Amino acid sequence: MKALSVIHSTTSTDAEIPSTGSTKLVQQVCTTNPLHTTTSIDNHHADCTDGTAYNVPIQTSPPRKRYRQCGQSPSQHLQHSNPSIPSIPSASVDPGLCGVRTNSENCNKRRNHCGSQATPVIHLQGDPNCLKCLRFRLKRNCSHLFTQVSSTWHLTENDCTRDTKTGIITIHYYDEAQRNLFLNTVKIPSGIKSCIGYMSMLQFI
C-alpha cells in the first residue's frame, strides 16, 4: 500500500510526496465553516483507481418557501401546493336546502325563505281596541280569506314591562295565494301598521 502524507492547514498547502515512477500533488483546503467545507484532490488517476476512497461532501440548501400569490384564496394556495388535495367548489352548498336568502337586494318579502314548514302570516299593530274591532269584522265578513287569527298580544322588555301601548294581532293563511287575495280584498285602516312574514307552525303534544 502506498504511503500518503497529508498536511492540514487553514490555508491552501501544496506538498510533494515521492512515489514510484510519479509525483503526486495533493491539495487539501480546510476552512473553519463546517457547512461549506470543500475538498479538492489532484491526482494522476482521475477515476480514483489507486484504491483510495474519497468522501466529498455535497452542499445542500433548505427548500424555498412558497409564497401565496396576491388575491389567491387559502384553498387555492393549498391546492396549488399539494395537487393531491381536491379543490373545493365555491358554490357547493345549495341555498334552497337551508332556506337562506342569497340575494341581499331581494325585496320580495312575500316569498317563503324559511322552508316548507312555515306558514304565511300578517302582523297588524295598532291600538288594542281598534285591533279588536278589526278582528271581529274579519271573522264576520272575511273568514274565507284566512285560516286563523290570534288574540291581541304585545311585546315586553326584559323586565316584563311593555315597550309601547300598542297591541298586535297575527293572521295566518293557508298559502301565499290566500294571503295575496286577503291583501287585495281587505282594506287595512290607516292607524294600523302591517308586517308580512312567515311563522313555523308548532304542534303541541
Curated annotation (Swiss-Prot):
It holds the Pfam family PPV_E2_C. GO terms for biological process: regulation of DNA replication. It comes from the Viruses. It is found in: Host nucleus. Residues 7-20, 70-82 have a biased composition (Polar residues). The keyword DNA-binding does not apply. The keyword Ion transport does not apply. GO terms for molecular function: DNA binding; DNA-binding transcription factor activity. Keywords: Host nucleus. GO terms for cellular component: host cell nucleus. Its main location: host cell. Residues 1-20, 59-87 are annotated as: Disordered. Plays a role in limiting the replication of viral DNA in keratinocytes. Recruits the host NCoR/SMRT complex to viral replication foci to mediate repression of both viral replication and transcription. Belongs to the papillomaviridae E8^E2C protein family. This is Protein E8^E2C.
